[in-house]
């Protein structure tokens, strides 16, 4: 697991390289985290080697839009369309997005939870040229958080007397537990 200060350092290294280094691809290729760049329309124009391992697939330059992953889900397991993902929001809103968690579904069925760091890129005139995104793997942490949420929902369901509300909470607990289990299975099968 990366520490917050190490994550900040990696993000800053990537941003400095993309904004000013003529050899930015070499810098990004050496980063230990999945990193990719899109144009202003969201088409993927570059990805580093770590993206392939993380996404479980080779991204398609110019064809994949907004993200290098196959499918996306919210932190709680609901489907997240690529055009609604944090990278899309960063480009459309022309602002950094921080503090989000998403789950990537790989073609082999395994899942990885991650925190994205999408950051728009601008030319010297202030025009949007694209964005860079780093994906920090938080699978273990997210699985633990989902398990804790499942336990809380189950406890609450057991404590209330309204059967309808208890059933809703039990179903929520089952969903959180299932998503956590899918994440744990992914870490034990191929990390």
Q: PLM features: residue spans?
A:
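PAS/PAS-like sensory domains across diverse signaling proteins
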Residues: 41-43, 53
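Sensory modules in modular signal-transduction proteins
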Residues: 15-39
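PAS/PAC sensory module
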Residues: 101-103, 110-116, 132
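N-terminal capping loop/helix in small sensory signaling domains highlighted by a polar->aromatic N-x2-3-F motif
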Residues: 48-51
């Amino acid at each position: 697991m990366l520490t917050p200060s190490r994550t900040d350092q990696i993000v800053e290294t990537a941003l400095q390289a993309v904004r000013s280094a003529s050899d930015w691809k070499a810098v990004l290729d050496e980063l230990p985290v999945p990193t990719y760049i899109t144009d202003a329309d969201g088409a993927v124009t570059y990805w580093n080697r770590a993206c392939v391992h993380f996404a479980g697939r080779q991204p398609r330059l110019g064809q994949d839009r907004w993200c290098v992953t196959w499918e996306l889900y919210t932190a709680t397991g609901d489907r997240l369309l690529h055009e609604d993902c944090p990278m899309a929001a960063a480009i459309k809103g022309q602002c950094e997005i921080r503090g989000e968690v998403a789950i990537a579904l790989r073609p082999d069925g395994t899942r990885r939870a991650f925190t994205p760091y999408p950051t728009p890129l601008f030319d010297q005139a202030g025009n949007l040229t694209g964005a860079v995104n780093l994906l920090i793997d938080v699978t273990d942490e997210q699985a633990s958080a989902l398990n804790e949420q499942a336990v809380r929902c189950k406890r609450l369901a057991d404590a209330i007397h309204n059967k309808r509300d208890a059933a809703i909470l039990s179903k929520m607990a089952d969903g959180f537990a299932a998503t956590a289990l899918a994440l744990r299975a992914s870490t034990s099968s191929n990390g």
